[in-house]
Amino acid sequence: MIETRAVNHEYLGYSCQNTDNNIDFPPAPSSSYRINCLSITLGKGIKLYKIASTILQEFKMTNALGWIEVHIPSHTTSTSSKPIPINHSSLCTLANVFGIAWVLNPCRIISARFDTTTNTSTSTTTTTTAHTTSTTTSHIKSKHTATESTPKQRLISQISFTTVKGHLLTGEERFRIIYDINNDNVIFDMYSFSKPSNVLGWIALPYVRYVQGTFFREQAGAMRRLIERKEEGL
């Protein structure tokens, strides 16, 4: 049973820390881990947020890619025959490698929450801020000469899961749909930290890094297409 497998790293829950505050993309827990992150604006409105949250809950944006599948073995509800993610439930990814083999990697969900309201404070500065973001790293540098706290309300749907024994990698991955109540924006963000967990993982590392370089961008594109189809009634 995947639920009973031990987590294969010492940073359990790290991807969920500070996510209700300003640290949306935490730095790597140690220098040996690599960070991947991407954030895109999907549009505006609570209706869009609901559509995107449903897509996230069923991992449709991942399963739509064709070369990777997410499987949640159990936990259906009376209102849906489809498995839904809940805390501490098992999750497996099945990925096609080079078009010739499928690799199964076990995980465990550590955070599954939907439509959670958060209230935080943000700091507004009077100086310029340099902000660079890529699919692999996010860095923010600024000089604070004067700050002013303003309320920030957000509605969040989030799924975060950790690797367990038997996975090629060690680390965590997190997906969120965020509705900013203040400006009506809907954000889709993705974050992970990882490194190889065993010899096979190190051998496969060049391919894994190549895939990680495009994985979030592909899911962002799939999310947009699925939303468009839903809005068109297809």
Show which residues each predicted segment covers.
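General beta-strand recognition
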Residues: S160, N185-D189
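Short, solvent-exposed aromatic-acidic interface loops
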Residues: T163-H167, M190-V199
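A conserved amphipathic terminal alpha-helix motif
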Residues: S194-L234
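A general secondary-structure signal for short beta-strands and their flanking turns/coil
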Residues: Y33-I35, H88-S90, W102, R154-I156, ...
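Solvent-exposed residues in well-ordered beta-strands and their adjoining turns
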Residues: T41-G43, I178-D180, F193-K195
